[in-house]
Amino acid sequence: MWRASNEARLKGSAPPEHDPRVRGHLENPSAFLFVADDAGVVRGMAVGMQGLADDGAGPPIEGLCHVGAVFVAPDRWGDGLGGSLVDAVLEEAQTRGYTSAQLWTPADNARAHRLYTRRGFRRTGRQKRDDLGETIAHYERAL
């Protein structure tokens, strides 16, 4: 799913170097995953997990949920599926006792920026380059 979504967004092939990052999200012991399927075909996914200090390299930050691996099939872009998946992650995060949420998304992905700001996320002004050299922007919100 993530590969099809990224290939459409990047208008080319999604780098295989992203595979370990997505797998890492899914294998994280604190992770909770939501999947949207249509007759057994995955159409979208989103993951929530314990947020960590130092941009994911440090110790857990109490009360912080990291939202990651939000991917939607390109033919479902704009129909609300991504928002429903993010809403499900945020609702589950609250149920688990998280009090805030954060995420990183490509700085040039206007569709993602609209999705997250509609759900109460605000850009913090922090940006960095990910391990593949793409500029990503940080967002957060209270739960």
Label every PLM stretch briefly.
Residues M1-D75, V86-A88, E92, A142-L143:
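Acetyl-CoA-dependent GNAT
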Residues F34, G63, T99-Q102, P106-H113, ...:
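C-terminal "cap" of GNAT-fold acetyltransferases
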Residues R43, T124-G125:
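Local beta-strand/beta-hairpin segments that build beta-sheet-rich folds
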Residues A53-D54, G78, N109, R129:
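Surface-exposed, flexible loop/turn segments at secondary-structure boundaries
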Residues A73-D87, Q94-R96, A107-R114, R118-R119:
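Conserved glycine-rich acetyl-CoA-binding loop
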